[in-house]
Amino acid sequence: NKIRLQSAIQSKFGVDVIPGSYIYNKPLNYLKLKDKINSIKKRYDFVILDSSPNLNDEALSTILASDLLFVVTTPDYPTLSCSLKAAKLAKQRGRPVAGIIINKIRAPKFELSLENIEETLGIPVVARIPDDKNAVKALFTRIPQTIYKKKSPLAKEINNLSASLTFNKEKSSLISKLFGLDHKKEKVNRELLKESFYNSVFKD
């Protein structure tokens, strides 16, 4: 059954969310999502769309509705292949890809490195999010990981990325400062992203 967009919005933890359907299998109008997003854009500082990694109607609809894109990948060849196709499609459609987010890092020695991924996709990595068993628990309790385990490495990296998009300063530990870990490649990329973000999205 169809409902009004406003009626589908659910609010919790200071965020408005429109949940997706698990069983929706009807043909999509690629431009309809863009029209819907445009109708609510002015109410929010940011509207974030989470799409399927597969190149289907949902992904294309999301790409066309977005002003700026981030490609999420895991550090393995099968997923990277899908991410490469998604990045190429976005560029073909004239949508800028601001960065790569590497998710679920488990064993760095046996996974693709940041350098490998950047070289393959030609896009800077802006976040390296470690795998965390607490993410499963947070999902089960329906509490965001950044609230469920605020001090976990996963939560800290997500907050660091958020800081670059909201023009805030990242929080660094004393150990990171003492041992020069503040100059990680992904952090440098986030600083560059912060400088360019408002020029590309919020330009006059």
State what each model feature region is.
Residues 29, 33, 79, 154:
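Short, conserved glycine- and acidic-residue-centered signature motifs
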Residues 1-42, 139-141:
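P-loop/Walker-type NTP enzyme "switch/lid" segment
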Residues 33-37, 83, 157, 161, ...:
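Generic hydrophobic alpha-helical segments
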Residues 92-204:
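C-terminal lobe/tail of nucleotide-utilizing enzymes
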Residues 11, 43-46, 158-164:
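Broad hydrophobic/π-residue packing in well-ordered secondary structure
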Residues 35, 39-42, 46, 51-131, ...:
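Conserved catalytic-core segment of NTP-binding enzymes
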